[in-house]
Amino acid sequence: LMAYDVLIKGGRIYDGSGLPSYLGDVAVQDGRIVDTGRINGSAKRVVNADGLAVSPGFIDFHTHLDAQLLWDPLATSSCYHGVTTVIPGNCGLSLAPCKEPDRDTILKSFERVEAITLPALRAGVKWGFTTFGQYLDALRGKLGVNVASLVGHCALRQFVMGEASIERAATPAEIHQMKEVLKASV
């Protein structure tokens, strides 16, 4: 008889495979699902899921949580709904790379797509990063969700071209510089 860390008993399991849901149990060991079905075993913690749905965490492929993650590392607007992985940096928006003179320009782009005012963004984003890697370092070790962030093309253009990024096409030299900044970011 196997002993698990967690045993979720009697829930309706939606496993993400596309197959119909089924009543069963989920065994977790060392933070990973190790078995599903009708499980005869013991656990340090048993969760009664009778009448409840059980599923893997959801992935939100389209978020603008780049700023919010700095003051809300649980991403409560997502994790309270079963989301365990978020992908910020969508629609070309990301907080980094960003030079100090461009910070308000970048924050204003978030104000336009999020229901967060510019004063709230200014108060919530504690700058201390310029590069995308430094932004990721600012998040590291604090998050309650998995984060796989994209490098926003608007931030990349602003980083290389400044205000000209919204006025004209990039030159071949600027495109080359953007490629180098992007390579350093991923």
What are the language-model segments listed below?
Residues 2-7, 13-57:
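Histidine-rich, glycine-flanked metal-binding segment
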Residues 46, 66, 97-98:
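Short Asp/Glu-rich motifs
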Residues 71-185:
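Divalent-metal coordination cores built from histidine and acidic residues
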Residues 7, 27, 60, 87, ...:
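Structured core elements
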Residues 18-19, 59, 70, 161:
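Short capping/connector residues at structural and topological boundaries
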Residues 53-77:
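Di-metal (Zn2+ and/or Mg2+/Mn2+) metal-binding site signature of metallo-dependent hydrolases
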Residues 17, 37, 67-69, 87:
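Activation segment
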